[in-house]
């Protein structure tokens, strides 16, 4: 993480002003993407700058770097980073391997086909070469979805959704999110009633606002 923090400061300076779109900075930005992948760090602004430079300078396009950017964006679901990055890649490059495979994985995650995602990932594990912490980051997203969707879930189903975890691995994630299991194999996620927090909305309308509306309507 020390290397990432050091590079982050330097990259931050590069991204200011007109220098942001200077193709001479691409090599530095591409190394920064690789550092993010290795150190399980993330900088969306810098990654979008790389994709924008590829748009302006198609001859400099790097498939491997783009793949790393997409995979890092997936680790930040449910935020819309993946969609933002995808929209900056032209259709021809989207059809290339491994970008095509990563876009498919992203589609499976965004549509919550989690079991199919793990199966597809298992068939393309080479995609994760040099990417630290990818699978656990995805599991955090899946746990987020489970937490807002279920009150109870079968133990076997949760294990499948998280990538066929062993019982001991599953217990680690249950402990992390405060989920408990009963003897029947059901996992208690949360009470939806407890998670609903009513909001009191108070809107103040002063006389000046009302009088101006009345005047304009006459």
Curated annotation (Swiss-Prot):
One GO cellular component, as annotated: cytosol
Keyword check for Nuclease: no
Modified residues (Phosphoserine): 217
Subcellular location: Nucleus; Cytoplasm
Residues covered by the PCI domain: 42-204
Keywords in alphabetical order: Acetylation, Cytoplasm, Initiation factor, Nucleus, Phosphoprotein, Protein biosynthesis
InterPro entries xrefs: ARM-type_fold (IPR016024), CSN8_PSD8_EIF3K (IPR033464), eIF3k (IPR009374), PCI_dom (IPR000717), Transl_init_fac_sub12_N_euk (IPR016020), WH-like_DNA-bd_sf (IPR036388), WH_DNA-bd_sf (IPR036390)
Modified residues (Phosphothreonine): 28
The UniProt record lists the keyword Acetylation: yes
Biological process, per Gene Ontology: formation of cytoplasmic translation initiation complex; regulation of translational initiation; translational initiation
N-acetylalanine sites (modified residues): 2
Domain of life: Eukaryota
Free-text function comment from the UniProt entry: Component of the eukaryotic translation initiation factor 3 (eIF-3) complex, which is required for several steps in the initiation of protein synthesis. The eIF-3 complex associates with the 40S ribosome and facilitates the recruitment of eIF-1, eIF-1A, eIF-2:GTP:methionyl-tRNAi and eIF-5 to form the 43S pre-initiation complex (43S PIC). The eIF-3 complex stimulates mRNA recruitment to the 43S PIC and scanning of the mRNA for AUG recognition.
Protein family according to the UniProt entry: Belongs to the eIF-3 subunit K family.
Subunit structure: Component of the eukaryotic translation initiation factor 3 (eIF-3) complex, which is composed of 13 subunits: EIF3A, EIF3B, EIF3C, EIF3D, EIF3E, EIF3F, EIF3G, EIF3H, EIF3I, EIF3J, EIF3K, EIF3L and EIF3M. The eIF-3 complex appears to include 3 stable modules: module A is composed of EIF3A, EIF3B, EIF3G and EIF3I; module B is composed of EIF3F, EIF3H, and EIF3M; and module C is composed of EIF3C, EIF3D, EIF3E, EIF3K and EIF3L. EIF3C of module C binds EIF3B of module A and EIF3H of module B, thereby linking the three modules. EIF3J is a labile subunit that binds to the eIF-3 complex via EIF3B.
Name this polypeptide is given: Eukaryotic translation initiation factor 3 subunit K
Organism name: Bos taurus
Name of the gene: EIF3K
């Amino acid at each position: 993480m020390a290397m990432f923090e050091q590079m982050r400061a330097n990259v931050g300076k590069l991204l200011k002003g007109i220098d942001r779109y200077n193709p001479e900075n691409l090599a530095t930005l591409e190394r920064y993407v690789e550092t993010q992948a290795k150190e399980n760090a993330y900088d969306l602004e810098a990654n979008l700058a790389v994709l924008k430079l590829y748009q302006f300078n198609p001859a400099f396009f790097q498939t491997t770097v783009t793949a790393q950017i997409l995979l890092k964006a997936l680790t930040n679901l449910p935020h819309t980073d993946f969609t933002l990055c995808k929209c900056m890649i032209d259709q021809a490059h989207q059809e290339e391997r491994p970008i095509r495979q990563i876009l498919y994985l992203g589609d499976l995650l965004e549509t919550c086909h989690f079991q199919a995602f793990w199966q597809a990932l298992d068939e393309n594990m080479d995609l994760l070469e040099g990417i630290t912490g990818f699978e656990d980051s995805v599991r955090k997203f899946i746990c987020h979805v489970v937490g807002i969707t279920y009150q109870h879930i079968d133990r076997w189903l949760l294990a499948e959704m998280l990538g066929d975890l062993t019982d001991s691995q599953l217990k680690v994630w249950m402990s992390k999110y405060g989920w408990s299991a009963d003897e029947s194999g059901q996992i208690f996620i949360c009470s939806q009633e407890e998670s609903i927090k009513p909001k009191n909305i108070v809107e103040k309308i002063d006389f000046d606002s009302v009088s101006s509306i009345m005047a304009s309507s006459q």
